[in-house]
């Protein structure tokens, strides 16, 4: 949730904290960024059980007990709330902190309170009355109470001001003395509020209010696998984002900056699909973001619909799936047996399971009838990796020097905070052996199977190969894998008809395309009127075909910000799981 979608403001940050970052994580960009920070004397803090790599060059190091990062972070939040070192203006204007929470008993308890038009609202400081959250001139009141309903901020403060989050209560478990935790919180507060920076730049927010400057809290954070490789990793990442938000450091000068096309409204992402029928393609994308328990990948009897058990009560937020569970689950026949295992450059016994011997046994194990438990394995790779010996069918791939590749804004972006960008690779030499680029093989397979997206109305193949697909495929009208040089004349950016000369234009430009945003669009992307309107026009934010066809939740800057705004501690999508557990919302979990 850090390097893929954003990065610290290397130019302005004064205080940079690393959580669980090893030297091979996000290696080159963070090395360059750290070089900039050290070169101008910014303070670097490492939180990691061992002091190697990046932590070795940190100005201070906190040798935390593994898996307790979230507890430390929430203790820092406790200290900041206790000291009143919280960016109240940021929380009120740019987050859901001033929204009211339904506190009435019943199925809506704990969810965001809605008005008669089913829209969330706030109490306006000017009038003391309910007002639209995104209304022009509205001044949301964080401390308001309306008919017994309190704000998200009040619920959050009440929770984390509890004594169980005090440094003295967590010190032993974290392995960090209480005095050091309090000192760290004081440092964060000092830099954020006493060393704030202000950039003189006129900009207009989504409400239509104009500002003369951009206020920044020059504190930034970066976290990697060290926090996520624990059963509490999801909640630890949430806690760290909460800390950033409370300090007012998200999308402000010196803080954490999104890389376009992010931030995106939730509705711009697909939901996972899992309904299958013989002879028909899947009902939609197999990965995505669940909005509630009714979208979990469960069969009618409550059993997992996917072999990896992603998007279940056990693993509800599996945006990328659970690849490491594929072979163990297939071998166990849990939740079901499989016929064929198809892998691409996935040397799973060696680089994904952390249990090489056991996985090799699973791949060759037989049942009581002498048949392989995993009957067939198809494998594609450019190299003769160890996995080749276990495959029944091998599809030799090309190397990256022999094929076209596309690094797309539709996937993990290579953008920078100030610019949207994508790129290609193109063949510099022809293969001298009997191999085919795997992407082209997939395009061919799609056509042979008659999949709708790969064939014309007459059943003929729609694309010649992957290069043809890159240029001519459209995810939405005018939006394809590459954003540069679109349109029949090649002058459109982001949205435009396919351009037959697009790949050549990329090659002439060093294989890259880049669109720089103006200084007015640099910060507050989630609330910046000009950025949101331009991002919509370029197709960076918008709907997902087949998921929300009109998807015009972002057709105006106000609507875009309403959906892309920063969520604080309370999120309806998460609260719905508690409701389902309690028997509300039409879906109930089992005891697990």
Tell me what each language-model feature is.
Residues 55-56, 60-209, 213-214:
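Long, well-ordered, tryptophan-enriched scaffold segments
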Residues 1-47, 71, 241-390, 399, ...:
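Extended redox/cofactor-interaction regions of prokaryotic respiratory oxidoreductases
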Residues 53, 391-423:
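Flexible glycine/proline-rich, aromatic-decorated loop/lid segments
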Residues 86-90, 179-182, 195-197, 220, ...:
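Acidic/polar loop patches that form or flank catalytic/metal-binding clefts of enzymes
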Residues 51-61, 385-393:
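Glycine-rich, charge-decorated loop segments at or immediately adjacent to ligand/cofactor-binding or catalytic sites
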Residues 419-517:
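Long, C-terminal catalytic modules of enzymes
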Residues 14-16, 41-45, 59-61, 109-111, ...:
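Beta-sheet entry/capping signal
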Residues 152-157, 163, 168-318:
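Active-site phosphate/pyrophosphate-binding segments
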């Amino acid at each position: 949730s850090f390097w893929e979608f954003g990065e610290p403001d290397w130019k302005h940050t004064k205080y940079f904290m690393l959580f669980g970052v090893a030297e091979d994580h996000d290696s080159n960009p963070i090395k360059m960024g750290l070089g900039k920070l050290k070169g101008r004397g910014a303070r670097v803090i490492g939180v990691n059980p061992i002091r190697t790599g990046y932590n070795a060059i940190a100005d201070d190091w906190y040798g935390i007990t593994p898996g307790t990062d979230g507890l430390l972070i929430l203790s820092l939040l406790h200290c900041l709330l206790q000291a009143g070192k919280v960016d109240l203006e940021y929380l009120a204007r740019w987050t859901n902190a001033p929204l009211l929470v339904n506190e009435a008993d019943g199925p809506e308890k704990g969810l965001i309170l809605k008005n008669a038009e089913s829209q969330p609202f706030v109490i306006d400081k000017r009038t003391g009355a309910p007002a639209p959250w995104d209304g022009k001139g509205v001044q949301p009141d964080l401390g308001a109470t309306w008919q017994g309903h309190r704000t998200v901020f009040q619920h959050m403060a009440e929770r984390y001001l509890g004594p169980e989050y005090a440094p003295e209560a967590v010190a032993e478990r974290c392995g960090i003395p209480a005095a050091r935790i309090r000192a760290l919180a004081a440092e964060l507060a000092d830099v954020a509020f006493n060393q704030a920076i202000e950039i003189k730049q006129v900009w207009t927010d989504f409400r239509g209010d104009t500002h003369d400057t951009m206020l920044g809290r020059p504190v930034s954070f970066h976290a990697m696998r060290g926090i996520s490789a624990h059963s509490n990793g999801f909640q630890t990442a949430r806690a760290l984002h909460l800390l950033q938000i409370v300090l007012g450091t998200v999308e402000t000068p010196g803080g954490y900056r999104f890389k376009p096309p992010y931030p995106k409204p939730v509705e711009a992402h697909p939901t996972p699909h899992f309904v299958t029928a013989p002879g028909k393609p899947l009902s939609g994308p197999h990965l995505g973001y669940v909005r509630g328990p009714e979208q979990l990948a469960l069969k009618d009897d409550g059993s997992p619909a996917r072999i990896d058990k992603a998007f279940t009560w056990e693993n509800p937020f599996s945006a990328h799936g659970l690849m490491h569970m594929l072979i163990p689950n297939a071998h166990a026949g849990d939740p079901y047996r499989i016929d064929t295992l198809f892998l691409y450059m996935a040397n799973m016994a060696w680089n994904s399971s952390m249990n090489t011997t056991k996985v090799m046994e699973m791949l060759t194990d037989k049942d009581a009838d002498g048949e392989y438990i995993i009957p067939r394995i198809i494998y594609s790779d450019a190299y003769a990796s160890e996995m080749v010996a276990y495959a029944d069918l091998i599809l030799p791939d090309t190397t990256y020097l022999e094929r076209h590749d596309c690094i797309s804004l539709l996937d993990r972006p290579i953008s920078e905070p100030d610019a949207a960008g994508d790129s290609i690779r193109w063949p510099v030499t022809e293969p001298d052996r009997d191999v085919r680029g795997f992407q082209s093989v997939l395009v061919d397979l799609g056509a042979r199977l008659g999949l709708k997206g790969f064939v014309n109305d007459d059943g003929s193949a729609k694309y010649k190969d992957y290069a043809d697909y890159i240029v001519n495929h459209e995810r939405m009208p005018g939006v394809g894998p590459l954003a540069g040089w679109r349109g029949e004349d090649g002058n459109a950016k982001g949205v435009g008809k396919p351009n037959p000369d697009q790949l050549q234009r990329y090659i002439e430009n060093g294989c890259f395309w880049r669109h720089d945003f103006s200084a007015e669009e640099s910060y507050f992307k989630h609330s910046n009127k000009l950025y949101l309107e331009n991002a919509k026009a370029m197709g960076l934010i918008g709907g997902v075909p087949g998921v929300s066809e009109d998807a015009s939740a972002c057709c105006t800057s106000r609507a875009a910000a309403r959906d892309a705004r920063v969520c604080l501690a309370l999120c309806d999508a998460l609260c719905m799981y508690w409701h389902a557990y309690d028997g509300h919302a039409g879906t109930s979990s089992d005891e697990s």
